[in-house]
Regions:
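His/Glu-rich zincin catalytic helix
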Residues: 1-78, 99, 116
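Acidic/histidine-enriched segments that form metal/cofactor-coordinating
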Residues: 69, 77-173
Length: 173
């Protein structure tokens, strides 16, 4: 594993960047205050998709929250949110990120728990077959199934006509 140290003027301590042999980077940055953030950034988004697999990055983002072999669906969120965490993810054109932000806790207990749970979610996700949903026509507005495939399609439909989406798409090709 390769280690790099970077100095930033607005941080009191050096930032450590660890790059694994597979290219995965782990960045550790200390910032004064009572909150911590654990996040993973994945180099995938709609820019990597084509007409046949359009939306797959966003779909996988949703499926990552369906549990792991160690923690069933909902347990990850329940444990962290009970400690005041915000747990979420987002998919953009060129990346997808997953994050947990929460109070550090005594002796960094929440930070350590967040790292453990986040690492489990990122390395051992379970994708239940029933969440895939049956094939359907994306233009069929009568589909009411709430499995993740349909939830993502509905989110795409809702955003597609938003003015900010049109501006973003027109200026970010």
């Amino acid at each position: 594993m390769k280690e790099t140290t970077v100095k930033y003027p607005f941080l009191t301590k050096d930032v450590k960047i660890y790059e694994q042999d597979n290219g995965h980077k782990i960045v550790l940055a200390y910032k004064e205050g009572g909150m911590v953030n654990v996040s993973s950034w994945v180099k995938t988004g709609s820019i990597n998709e084509n007409e046949k697999n359009n939306g797959i990055s966003h779909f996988l983002e949703h499926l990552m929250f369906k549990g792991t072999h160690k923690h069933p669906a909902g347990e990850f969120d329940h444990i962290l949110e009970a400690r005041g965490a915000i747990v979420n993810a987002a998919t953009w054109k060129d990346y997808t990120f997953y994050y947990v932000t929460l109070p550090k806790g005594e002796n960094n207990e929440n930070f350590n728990l967040a790292i453990e749970l986040h690492a489990d979610m990122m390395t051992d996700p379970v994708v239940p077959d029933y969440e895939m949903g049956a094939p359907f026509n994306i233009n069929d507005k009568t589909v009411t199934d709430k499995r993740e495939r349909h939830v993502v399609i509905e989110e795409i439909r809702m955003r597609k006509d938003q003015p900010w989406t049109k501006v973003y798409n027109a200026t970010n090709h």
